């Protein structure tokens, strides 16, 4: 799909990865609406990058746990931007709880992670289905995690939410075909992000050593994979892993 003059909605556009995705889509010719919660300064910085690229930017405050807020955001982007061709479900929430410490993962925390990371993307995809299908080929790209492919992320709740998002990708690819293609990007450790900076040095260095390329991904790498999937006309229901080639996540068929 040619991306010039397409309208993209990126959730969590105020963060490191979301901001990079917005920048890459703007560079590819898209007008970009982005959602944020709390981080107004980050959202405004991203919007400035989009407008500096000569594209329109639109900010939307969104609570991904609230169905009314989700429906309002969907209506907002269509009204303000004249439609929506691309949805990037990037926004997520996490809390670091080691897997064995089940007693620390209470029901409220579990619900917050799953509602933000899985329920929210489903509801927003559903709300924008007609708008995405109205053009010459809509696109949804879900940003998951390698933690959704195998245990090892910062909490069981996060890992399960991202596994669900990967399978939601498969399900929506069937449900929304042929008008909308639905794909997924699963990052590993992403250099330079706030989440990566919170990791112990030994953990980050271990990830770099294990990667067969000798390095892990950056926010720009995640953005590039997202743009690739937006452009692709015959890819749907797929997950691209961006982690430098971690042996445990590789499948050579």
Indicate residue ranges for each PLM-predicted region.
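Residue(s) in the substrate-gating loop at a strand-loop-helix junction
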Residues: 145
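Substrate-binding pocket helix/loop in short-chain dehydrogenase/reductase
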Residues: 98-114, 196, 207
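Conserved glycine-rich cofactor-binding loop
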Residues: 14-15
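C-terminal substrate-recognition "lid" of short-chain dehydrogenase/reductases
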Residues: 2, 125, 177, 215-242, ...
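Active-site helix of classical SDR
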Residues: 125, 161, 169
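Short C-terminal tail/terminal secondary-structure segment
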Residues: 94, 99, 150, 236-253
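Alpha-helical segment proximal to the catalytic Tyr-Lys
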Residues: 130, 173-178
């Amino acid at each position: 799909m040619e991306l010039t003059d397409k309208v993209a909605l990126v959730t969590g556009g105020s963060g490191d990865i979301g901001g990079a995705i917005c920048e890459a889509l703007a560079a590819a010719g898209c007008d970009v609406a982005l959602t944020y919660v709390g981080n107004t300064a980050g959202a405004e910085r991203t919007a400035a990058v989009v407008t500096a690229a000569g594209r329109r930017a639109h900010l939307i405050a969104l609570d991904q746990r609230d169905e009314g807020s989700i429906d309002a955001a969907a209506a907002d982007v269509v009204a303000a931007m004249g439609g929506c061709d691309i949805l990037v479900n990037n926004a997520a929430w996490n809390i670091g709880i080691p897997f064995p410490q089940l007693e620390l993962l209470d029901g409220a925390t579990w619900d917050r992670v799953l509602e933000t990371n899985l329920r929210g993307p489903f509801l927003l995809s559903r709300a924008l289905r007609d708008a995405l299908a109205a053009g010459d080929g809509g696109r949804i790209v879900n940003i998951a995690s390698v933690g959704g492919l195998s245990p090892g992320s910062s909490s069981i709740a996060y890992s399960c939410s991202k596994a669900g998002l990967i399978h939601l990708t498969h399900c929506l690819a069937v449900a929304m075909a042929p008008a909308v293609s639905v794909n997924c990007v699963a990052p590993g450790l992403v250099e330079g992000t706030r989440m990566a900076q919170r990791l112990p040095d030994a953990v980050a260095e271990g990830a770099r050593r294990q990667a067969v390329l000798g390095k892990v991904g950056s926010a720009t790498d995640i953005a590039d994979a997202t743009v690739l999937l937006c452009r692709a006309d015959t890819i749907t229901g797929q997950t691209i892993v961006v982690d430098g080639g971690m042996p445990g996540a590789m499948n050579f068929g």
